[in-house]
């Protein structure tokens, strides 16, 4: 098993052999078509951002806490850490929390980014943190929203609270950042852990403004997990919605059929055109770091290998293998490691 893969020009052929041999053969649409299709799926009426922030200044960091609007009635809470060096513009990184978390969970990495001269930005995902009046109760409201989206019968009002809607919010957050006079619009990065990493590969794939990407315990293949009975970890993140779907479909247990039914409704085409092996192709030739763990049940390694192999093929075709790297921590389950935390910071520093 391949535990550590660091791909640079001198070692690309050796590292690819094991990966490419496992790749599932799917004839995805072109990258341009996939990007256009994903944007069309998530498009919604354009509204003014109407940003509003409170600013707190300390000796080491300027903290901005506020919000923008991504939709008419959808306020996106944002936390920004800005360096105090007085530079005219800064590179900026959006970093995203995992399931049941909140933007404040990322204070440590935001502060470390500031120490490296980078503006750090974090948001609350849909139905997390301040998106819920009084604060969300872990993932309770998120799972309830996914369940409601499953039970919705009005196609014109179908929502996608499971990952997709937050990806749209990230496009609007990027719109806001490039509108700021203190942000260098050609020096933007995005990353996240677990759910936040998935939201990153969804949003960044179709948004070329994001130049540097880090994906932590989030790269996978939804199709591989479904086809190989390794869906349990991923399904567990919104298990209540899946259990309701199984009941609605007359099943006494979770199975491939009712799981796919939920994904087809809440995450259309996540097992084909918008699966990770397809969307990672869109990252090339931008700087991409993938980190994960060997025994992650949420992102099984064989599916992650397929996604990475697909990405590598795209980077090879664009002569950009020096801008993609991967590290897999052996023996660990679904967890982010201190080593990967440092790699994340180093990657953003190197390429921004």
Model-derived regions: residue spans:
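Alpha/beta-hydrolase fold nucleophile elbow
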Residues: 182-194
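N-terminal cap/lid segment of alpha/beta-hydrolase-fold proteins
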Residues: 40-88
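Mobile cap/lid helix-loop segments that gate and shape the active-site cleft of serine hydrolases
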Residues: 212-279, 300, 304-308, 316-321
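Bacterial Sec-dependent N-terminal signal peptides
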Residues: 1-26
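Cap/lid segment of the alpha/beta-hydrolase catalytic domain
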Residues: 88, 99-168, 224-229
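Short glycine-enriched nucleophile-adjacent loop
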Residues: 197-208
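C-terminal catalytic histidine-bearing segment of alpha/beta-hydrolase fold enzymes
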Residues: 245, 308-352
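Conserved strand-to-loop "acid loop" that flanks and positions the catalytic carboxylate
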Residues: 284-301
